[in-house]
Amino acid sequence: MPDMPLRILVETIERLELVTARTQLVAFLVNLFKQTPPEIIDKVVYLVQGILWPDWKGMPELGVGEKMLIKAISLACNISEREVEKTAKEIGDIGKATEKLKQTAQSKQTGLTIFAFTQQPTGLTVTNTYNTLVKIAMAQGEGSKDLKIRLLAGLLKDASPKEAKFIVKFVEGKLRVGIGDATIMDALAVTFGGGVANRPVIERAYNLRSDLGEVAKILASKGIEELKKIKPEVGVPIRPMLAERLSDPREILVKTGGEAFVEYKYDGERAQIHKKGDKIWIYSRRLENITSQYPDVVERALEKIKADEAIVEGEIVVYDPDTGELKPFQELMHRKRKHDIRQAIKEYPVKVFLFDLLYLNGEDYTLKPLPVRREALEKIIDKTEDFTIAEYIKTSNPEELEKFFLEAIGNGVEGVMAKAIHKDSIYQAGVRGWLWIKYKRDYKSEMADTVDLVVVGAFYGKGRRGGKYGALLMAAYNKEKDVFETVCKVGSGFKDEDLDKLPDMLKPYIRDRKHPRVVAEIEPDVWVDPVLVAEIIGAELTLSPIHTCAKGVIKPDAGISIRFPRFIRWRPDKRPEDATTSSELVEMYQRQLKKITTEQATQEQL
């Protein structure tokens, strides 16, 4: 089987770590992909992503802790574990320490200078490296710890110093290349897809299969036409369609084409339920397999979905069985427990509110208009009180929309979702657009809605908060540039227990310099990988010379910021790329400005 030296991948990774411009990142990836045999391009894509396989597959993690890693390095370099720990402490990076220790150990063995040895080829290839890492992950049960150490030590022993650094960083989960899926798709389009004009074909395939390695392999080996044939597959999560937001019923109906389905927006966990015969899979909006958390939903889905094969989407919400009252999203956290799930079912019972159908008995429904999808959904669901269709109306009247919204708020939900129902109202997997619009208001704030922002840095607290983190640097996602742009520094809204948990939450993501995908002019005390998402509210959107969100779009040398930002809650159900986008904040700011101007004109007339 065709293969490629690991050295080529490692050299590319090193180059990628030194640049931030997307054009350069794409150029380096294109060069790498051109050298990669189609048979192994899936493995190359996974390794660039820093994974062995997509998370949704539910495969084991590597399971190598720091002590095991140190033991493997000591065996590979034929030195004591204490020496490994000492070097890692001096350098502050166990990957770089491994590189140095390999250079020293192997130059002694060969008599070559350190520089000369770094140039020596090794026998490691992408395939044997990937396969060994898979063996490490799959080693389970009695004796697995020693087996993992031996396998990793053997891999490091055969590696060059630079390859060893790469392997250690991969095992640590700290392969911080700064490349998002969007950048990889750009490179695939240029290399195999006939140019960026065919990028939408690649993106749709990825949004339906949620596996960039698989998409790359089909594209590289069979071409763009084969990729166009991809459709949903039961058991493989589809990336969820996302909504824009507005706070004016008239504007909402204009955007949806004059008419819409308007449905309750429940404060629960978005879930994609797959059925194939007597098998059920449930995936979260982050594509995590959450089937084990909801055995009660599995039972209902098997009984109530009247189809051999189907993919439906809805919201899982905790409720009070005595009063029927719907509970907030946070209550679902109790379902995350791995033990006593039956007890959790009794204490935190759930209802399922379905709102879409994506696949039915071999037929792709994502390309059908919403009314067709909804009609088919109604036909296959045997509705009960705890497994039903989301409450909705069809309207072209803004007053009726507002009345339904107020009714929804009164019934304890977050707001409503307005969804276009014209002939082009397809299900846009993985896309945020105007076919779906959130209408949701926080009456305690001048801001029309909360926003979801990504943590990119942290500041140490003062006074009562001394000795721990007191504030976080938050960023929005710029989809066009595939970067995160700072919006605000948030230090209020946190409970003491929130602040107490911050060090442990941030520890896996702390880095010694700004992440390549973060655009910031403000310097926090600690930089953080853009991973954690939080819901934020504020008094209003404003312009700031120190924040980079949509900088220069509204006003030269000024970005969009939030005045008096306040932490609401963590959003573990959202990926960083699901955060509020820079373009959304531009639209929110412009609507806010329009509202203020209108109110001022009214006051002047009075």
Curated annotation (Swiss-Prot):
Pfam families assigned to the protein according to its UniProt record, in alphabetical order: DNA_ligase_A_C, DNA_ligase_A_M, DNA_ligase_A_N
Keywords, sorted A to Z: ATP-binding, Cell cycle, Cell division, DNA damage, DNA recombination, DNA repair, DNA replication, GTP-binding, Ligase, Magnesium, Manganese, Metal-binding, Nucleotide-binding
Cofactor dependence: Mg(2+); Mn(2+)
Keyword Transmembrane helix set for record: no
Temperature-dependence annotation: Optimum temperature is 75 degrees Celsius. Activity declines drastically at temperatures from 75 to 80 degrees Celsius.
SUPFAM superfamilies for this protein: ATP-dependent DNA ligase DNA-binding domain, DNA ligase/mRNA capping enzyme, catalytic domain, Nucleic acid-binding proteins
Top EC class of this enzyme: ligase
Active-site residue list: 265 (n6-amp-lysine intermediate)
Activity dependence on pH, as recorded: Optimum pH is 7.0.
EC number: 6.5.1.7
Position of the signal peptide: none
Family in the record: Belongs to the ATP-dependent DNA ligase family.
Protein name in the entry: DNA ligase
Organism: Sulfophobococcus zilligii
